[in-house]
From Swiss-Prot:
Listed Pro residues bias regions: 454-465
Protein source organism: Danio rerio (Zebrafish)
Domain free text: The IMD domain is predicted to have a helical structure. It may induce actin bundling and filopodia formation.
UniProt KW Transmembrane keyword: no
Residue ranges, compositional bias (Polar residues): 226-236, 355-376
Ranges where the record places region Disordered: 200-273, 355-516
Entry keyword Thylakoid: no
Subcellular location, record wording: Cell membrane
GO molecular function terms listed in the Swiss-Prot or TrEMBL record: lipid binding
Ranges for domain IMD: 1-227
Signal sequence, start to end: none
Name of protein: BAR/IMD domain-containing adapter protein 2-like 2
Residue ranges with Low complexity bias: 249-270
One biological process term in Gene Ontology: actin filament bundle assembly
Length: 516
């Protein structure tokens, strides 16, 4: 009877190995291929959707220039922008699906093929050795216990228990990844559903109002107002061109006087409501691996697109490249504070404050400034000091107190808050990318992360809507009877579905704020 039980255990263990090697891993590879095709189809859909709703927005602009359909043109523009925002939101979910599901499955299935094959070879070799040892003991009569309590039977039971756990681990990985995808879609629906319903009702009311109101003939006052608006737009366009002349080479993608729209812009920007003030970089901001940070060189012109800094960070546009992103507020200063270098030196040589400053203090200022990690934005002088602020970082004319206070301000920049604004007009792109510091491939829950976070050097970890799964290593260790010899069927550190791997935090490139 014991021989029958051992044979059943051995065959059951081999069948699980065959299932993983012949069915699970090929099926997982097929899912990866189909998932990549799914993403390509959505990308084609998003591209066509962008072209369609861009054309719809142009039709709305044409309606805005008429006297009878201005309200309808506004409705068309808002519908176009909202649909493009929804497409951008869905693109974030699909990017998460590609990185966290498809790439993880593809990587694990390639590693698991060799891992399971090696584990099966170790198992079969150990079974043969245990069976030969038991047979020698029975032949010599040295084995007096029952066959059920032998090391051979214990090894068969333990091996079957471990391979069943490995099989469960792989199917749990597949289920958890797609639960995370469902949670991402549900989060997107809950975030945008209410505001979209309110907007749709408002659009329907405006269309109904235009149906009930009769078209009127334009009066001379209306014609005069339209003429004034057209002349004002032409004058405004000329002023903008004159403002750009002293700024150097005009970029090839200079902003048009007409309102432009992009997928990542807000509704306020698309209607021409967003403004900005011109700033100049006092030091260079080098490029980094974070795509939301805006690199620039010293002396470059930037247009700040938000009215006030957010925890020490500004969001703006680099005028030469028209690229947008975040940068420290201490790295720029107003263009009004800058004068030509020769004039600055002349004023500095005749300044009374410079005559009173000792040389040692200037040297200490320079040395202290070199120790500061980033420069502090220059403060306005009093009316009696006629010195101009030079864009060079060597500010020898500042006092020690001024430098210390600036140094303290820079080093105490708080990390920006990561709370989301859930207002009806907030349809910023999100993508719940999980931030996993020490996550097992199969033993941890999928956490959702927002792409709306500001990009500080070390942002705080967001609270996940999913409960954190605690891994209990002691519960997975099978309880053995009689302490059979340890065998490396599934050695730690090489299992692609259980190895803990650290990964850096990734910030989405859709962190732009709503520009009022």
């Amino acid at each position: 009877m014991s021989g029958v039980n051992s044979d059943l255990l051995h065959r059951s263990t081999l069948s699980v190995y065959n299932n993983l090697m012949d069915q699970f891993n090929p099926g997982l590879q097929k899912l990866v291929t189909l998932g990549n095709s799914y993403i390509k189809a959505f990308q084609a859909l998003a591209l066509t959707s962008e072209a369609y709703f861009s054309a719809l927005a142009k039709m709305g602009e044409q309606a805005l220039s008429t006297l009878s359909s201005r309200s309808l043109g506004d409705v068309l523009i808002q519908i176009s922008e909202t649909q493009r925002k929804l497409t951008a939101e869905a693109e974030g979910v699909f990017r998460w699906f590609h990185v966290e599901v498809l790439q993880a499955m593809d990587k694990n299935v390639k590693l698991d093929e060799e891992y399971i094959e090696g584990s099966r070879r170790v198992y079969e070799l150990e079974v043969r050795n245990q069976a030969a040892s038991l047979e020698r003991q029975l032949r010599r009569g040295a084995f007096r216990d029952s066959l059920e309590s032998s090391e051979y039977m214990q090894y068969l039971r333990q091996s079957q228990h471990e391979i069943l756990k490995e099989e469960e681990r792989r199917y749990r990985f597949l289920a958890e990844k797609h639960c995370g995808l469902t949670q991402s879609l549900l989060y997107l629906i809950n975030k945008t559903g209410v505001s979209l319903q309110q907007r749709a009702d408002g659009w329907k009311e405006k269309v109904s109002e235009s149906r009930s109101s009769r078209p009127r003939t334009p009066t001379p006052l209306d014609q005069e107002a339209q003429l004034k608006s057209s002349v004002g737009s032409l004058l405004q366009t000329g002023d903008r061109e004159m403002d750009r002349e002293p700024l150097g080479r005009v970029p090839s993608r200079a902003p048009s006087p007409l309102p432009s729209r992009s997928r990542s812009s807000s509704v306020g920007e698309s209607l021409g409501l967003g403004g900005g003030r011109s700033m100049r970089a006092i030091v260079s901001h080098p490029a980094s691996s974070n795509p939301v940070l805006l690199p620039f060189a010293r002396g470059d012109l930037l247009t700040v697109l938000i009215p006030e800094p957010r925890n020490g960070w500004l969001y703006g546009r680099h005028d030469p490249s028209l690229r947008q992103g975040w940068f420290p507020a201490a790295y720029v200063a107003s263009t009004e504070d800058f004068l030509p270098v020769g004039l600055s030196i002349s004023h500095r040589s005749h300044s009374m404050n410079n005559l009173l400053e000792p040389t040692s203090q200037s040297e200490s200022d320079t040395q202290t400034y070199s120790e500061v990690s980033s420069p502090v934005v220059s403060m306005r002088r009093a009316s009696a000091d006629v010195r101009s602020v030079s864009p060079l970082p060597e500010k020898k004319t500042e006092s020690n107190n001024e430098l210390k206070s600036g140094q303290k301000v820079f080093h105490e920049i708080p990390a920006p808050a990561t709370q989301l604004r859930r207002g009806s007009a907030d349809v910023r792109s999100i993508s719940p990318l999980p931030d996993r510091r020490a996550e097992s491939h199969f033993e941890s829950k999928v956490e959702l992360k927002n792409y709306n976070e500001l990009p500080p050097p070390a942002p705080p970890l967001p609270n996940s809507p999913l409960p954190e799964r605690k891994t209990d290593l002691t519960s997975e260790r099978p309880s053995t009877q009689g302490q059979p010899p340890e065998h490396p069927l599934f050695p730690r550190g090489s299992n692609p579905f259980a190895t803990v791997k650290l990964r850096p935090t990734v910030t989405n490139d859709r962190s732009a704020p709503r520009i009022q």
